[in-house]
Amino acid sequence: MSQWKYLVLFFIFIFGFILKTLSDAGEFKTLDPHFSGDCLPIPGVVGAEDITFLKNGTALISSDDRRGSYLGKDIHGTIYSYKPGENGEGLIDLFPNIKNDFHPHGISVYEDQNGGTFLAVVNHPSSGLFNSSGGHSIEIFHYDSDSLTHLRSVKDPLLVSPNDIVLINKDQFFVTNDHGSSSKLGQTLEKYLQLKNSNVLFYDGLNFDVAAIGLGFANGINISSDGSILYVAETIGKQLSIFEVDKTTNNLELMRSIDFNSGIDNIEIDHEGNLWIGSHPKVYTFSRHMKDSTVLSPSQVYRFSMDNSSYNIEEVYLNLGEELSGSTVAAVYGRTILIGSVFEAHFLDCKY
């Protein structure tokens, strides 16, 4: 075969690879925006990437100006508390004077039988937090009356690229690594080649162990109220993986994986046991939005329920990005949905 034919075949391969990648990322989807409710934008909170409700209806919000950090600005993130229905007046910065390098990501709350409330935060410091050394960390706090008291920092080499966390008590938790590689090149290859190299870790209060492997960008994580079922959102895998938890050993056994055909992100659970999942229907568009705020990224919210062998997936909210770009989380309390995103300078307080 002549040299030019090899060249033609090479370009055909590259073109086909690009088309497949864009198709897998949802770029050719036709989207029909809808929501049977009303949303109010709540300004003043930048990058409300994760939101979770306490049992009393107060929401805790993980906030960080990630674009500002990318541009080298000397800024830090924070945790807000928010009481829905007060038009933003119920918003309180729990770290107004923090000077440490605090860049929160996923969060989880555990409320014990004695009334104690504990918050775990995935943190991405560049120079450490609360006297911890550099690198990723899990920060544990006690929450009381709109104040946070830092209890400890947890670090380990297995925390390669932590994303989200779920406490099973005040000392133990599961955490996702959204990549298996810590290098930029390795992480880029994982994304575009859709490699399933990410994992879930379990921390027993002293040590980390790998609990699940072979996941396609393990992102949001949550657990059933009785602690028997663990849910993991795979953004690149576009599926929800459901694990049975051995309550004695906390080992995980994969029960099933359910296709969403969307880049699902954080998982919240309402009082009825329904999963609420923020999602990116067009993942490549979201990656462009990360670099350029003028590129709107569609926002999507699913409600997922499962009963024995049957399940139901309902798309509750879909917007092309005008109302909120790049939704990552939908936290629910009663008839209120709080929808957050990675970069926007507001979140949505919705009634449905």
Enumerate the predicted regions with their spans.
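Beta-strand-rich domains and repeat architectures in extracellular enzymes and scaffolds
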Residues: 40-77, 325-329, 342-344
